[in-house]
Protein backbone atom coordinates (compact mmCIF):
# COMPACT_ATOMS: atom_id res chain seq x y z
CA UNK A 1 0.00 0.00 0.00
CA UNK A 2 1.12 3.59 -0.60
CA UNK A 3 0.39 6.98 0.91
CA UNK A 4 -0.03 10.29 -0.90
CA UNK A 5 0.41 13.84 0.36
CA UNK A 6 -1.19 16.56 -1.79
CA UNK A 7 -0.84 20.31 -1.28
CA UNK A 8 -1.62 23.41 -3.39
CA UNK A 9 -0.78 27.10 -3.44
CA UNK A 10 -2.10 30.03 -5.47
CA UNK A 11 0.61 32.04 -7.23
CA UNK A 12 -0.35 35.53 -8.32
CA UNK A 13 1.41 35.36 -11.66
CA UNK A 14 0.21 34.35 -15.16
CA UNK A 15 -0.23 30.63 -15.76
CA UNK A 16 2.43 30.43 -18.50
CA UNK A 17 5.06 32.11 -16.29
CA UNK A 18 4.28 29.80 -13.36
CA UNK A 19 4.17 26.68 -15.55
CA UNK A 20 7.55 27.51 -17.11
CA UNK A 21 9.22 27.52 -13.68
CA UNK A 22 7.16 24.82 -11.94
CA UNK A 23 7.60 22.23 -14.70
CA UNK A 24 11.34 22.70 -15.29
CA UNK A 25 13.14 20.37 -12.86
CA UNK A 26 16.39 22.30 -13.24
CA UNK A 27 14.66 25.43 -11.93
CA UNK A 28 12.04 23.94 -9.58
CA UNK A 29 14.20 21.51 -7.61
CA UNK A 30 16.74 24.06 -6.33
CA UNK A 31 13.80 26.24 -5.22
CA UNK A 32 12.24 23.43 -3.20
CA UNK A 33 15.53 22.12 -1.82
CA UNK A 34 13.85 21.58 1.56
CA UNK A 35 12.23 18.48 0.06
CA UNK A 36 15.57 16.69 -0.13
CA UNK A 37 18.67 16.21 -2.28
CA UNK A 38 18.55 16.21 -6.08
CA UNK A 39 21.23 15.45 -8.69
CA UNK A 40 20.78 15.59 -12.46
CA UNK A 41 21.98 12.40 -14.19
CA UNK A 42 21.19 13.02 -17.85
CA UNK A 43 18.72 13.66 -20.64
CA UNK A 44 17.39 10.61 -22.49
CA UNK A 45 16.78 10.35 -26.24
CA UNK A 46 13.03 10.87 -25.80
CA UNK A 47 13.55 14.26 -24.07
CA UNK A 48 12.88 12.97 -20.56
CA UNK A 49 15.47 13.17 -17.80
CA UNK A 50 16.92 10.99 -15.08
CA UNK A 51 17.67 12.39 -11.64
CA UNK A 52 18.77 10.98 -8.31
CA UNK A 53 16.27 12.23 -5.75
CA UNK A 54 16.37 11.59 -2.04
CA UNK A 55 13.44 13.06 -0.15
CA UNK A 56 13.68 13.98 3.53
CA UNK A 57 11.04 12.04 5.46
CA UNK A 58 11.86 12.76 9.07
CA UNK A 59 15.34 11.48 9.89
CA UNK A 60 15.63 9.29 6.79
CA UNK A 61 16.16 9.91 3.08
CA UNK A 62 13.81 7.99 0.79
CA UNK A 63 14.33 7.85 -2.91
CA UNK A 64 16.68 6.81 -5.63
CA UNK A 65 16.83 7.18 -9.40
CA UNK A 66 13.72 8.69 -11.01
CA UNK A 67 12.47 9.18 -14.55
CA UNK A 68 11.25 12.78 -15.01
CA UNK A 69 8.71 13.84 -17.64
CA UNK A 70 8.20 17.57 -18.05
CA UNK A 71 5.45 18.88 -20.31
CA UNK A 72 3.99 22.20 -19.18
CA UNK A 73 1.68 22.51 -17.31
CA UNK A 74 2.72 19.24 -15.58
CA UNK A 75 5.88 17.65 -14.26
CA UNK A 76 5.93 14.04 -13.13
CA UNK A 77 8.51 11.63 -11.88
CA UNK A 78 8.41 7.94 -11.14
CA UNK A 79 11.08 5.95 -9.34
CA UNK A 80 13.06 3.46 -11.39
CA UNK A 81 15.43 2.42 -8.60
CA UNK A 82 15.34 2.73 -4.82
CA UNK A 83 12.31 3.53 -2.67
CA UNK A 84 9.09 3.46 -4.69
CA UNK A 85 7.80 6.99 -4.95
CA UNK A 86 6.33 9.40 -7.47
CA UNK A 87 5.54 13.08 -7.75
CA UNK A 88 3.08 15.14 -9.75
CA UNK A 89 3.40 18.91 -10.10
CA UNK A 90 0.46 20.47 -11.91
CA UNK A 91 -0.24 24.11 -12.76
CA UNK A 92 -3.85 25.12 -13.41
CA UNK A 93 -5.79 28.33 -14.00
CA UNK A 94 -6.95 30.39 -11.01
CA UNK A 95 -8.80 33.74 -10.98
CA UNK A 96 -5.81 35.33 -9.21
CA UNK A 97 -3.16 33.71 -11.43
CA UNK A 98 -2.31 30.01 -11.22
CA UNK A 99 -2.64 27.15 -8.77
CA UNK A 100 0.35 24.86 -8.30
CA UNK A 101 -0.48 21.43 -6.89
CA UNK A 102 2.13 18.93 -5.73
CA UNK A 103 1.22 15.32 -4.97
CA UNK A 104 3.88 12.98 -3.60
CA UNK A 105 3.28 9.24 -3.25
CA UNK A 106 5.59 7.05 -1.18
CA UNK A 107 5.38 3.28 -0.78
CA UNK A 108 7.29 1.75 2.13
CA UNK A 109 7.79 -1.94 2.79
CA UNK A 110 6.44 -3.89 5.72
CA UNK A 111 3.00 -4.77 6.92
CA UNK A 112 2.03 -3.14 10.20
CA UNK A 113 5.20 -1.08 10.65
CA UNK A 114 5.16 -0.15 6.96
CA UNK A 115 1.61 1.20 7.26
CA UNK A 116 2.52 3.14 10.40
CA UNK A 117 5.63 4.58 8.72
CA UNK A 118 3.55 5.60 5.69
CA UNK A 119 1.07 7.48 7.89
CA UNK A 120 3.90 9.37 9.57
CA UNK A 121 5.62 9.95 6.21
CA UNK A 122 2.44 11.46 4.73
CA UNK A 123 2.35 14.16 7.42
CA UNK A 124 6.04 14.97 7.09
CA UNK A 125 5.88 14.96 3.29
CA UNK A 126 2.83 17.23 3.39
CA UNK A 127 4.70 19.79 5.48
CA UNK A 128 7.67 19.63 3.10
CA UNK A 129 5.33 20.15 0.14
CA UNK A 130 3.77 23.22 1.78
CA UNK A 131 7.23 24.67 2.45
CA UNK A 132 8.38 23.94 -1.10
CA UNK A 133 5.24 25.46 -2.61
CA UNK A 134 5.65 28.59 -0.50
CA UNK A 135 9.28 28.91 -1.64
CA UNK A 136 8.12 28.59 -5.25
CA UNK A 137 5.33 31.14 -4.72
CA UNK A 138 7.70 33.59 -3.06
CA UNK A 139 10.24 33.22 -5.88
CA UNK A 140 7.61 33.85 -8.55
CA UNK A 141 5.77 36.69 -6.80
CA UNK A 142 8.69 38.59 -5.29
CA UNK A 143 11.82 37.37 -7.12
CA UNK A 144 12.55 37.39 -10.80
CA UNK A 145 11.47 34.21 -12.64
CA UNK A 146 14.29 32.38 -14.36
Language model features: what each stretch is:
Residues 2-10, 48-50, 61-63, 74, ...:
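Intrinsic-disorder/low-complexity, polar/charged segments enriched in Ser/Thr/Lys/Arg/Asp/Glu/Gln
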Residues 78-131:
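Beta-strand/loop substructures that line and gate deep hydrophobic ligand-binding cavities in soluble
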Residues 29-30, 39-83, 131-146:
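Glycine-rich portal/gate segments that line the openings of hydrophobic small-molecule binding cavities
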Residues 16-19, 130, 134:
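Amphipathic alpha-helical segments that line or abut small-molecule/effector binding pockets
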Amino acid sequence: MATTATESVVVRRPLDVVAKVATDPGVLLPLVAGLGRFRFIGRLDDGTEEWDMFLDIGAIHVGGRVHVVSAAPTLTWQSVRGTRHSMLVEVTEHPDGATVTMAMTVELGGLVLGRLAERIARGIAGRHLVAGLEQLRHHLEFGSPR
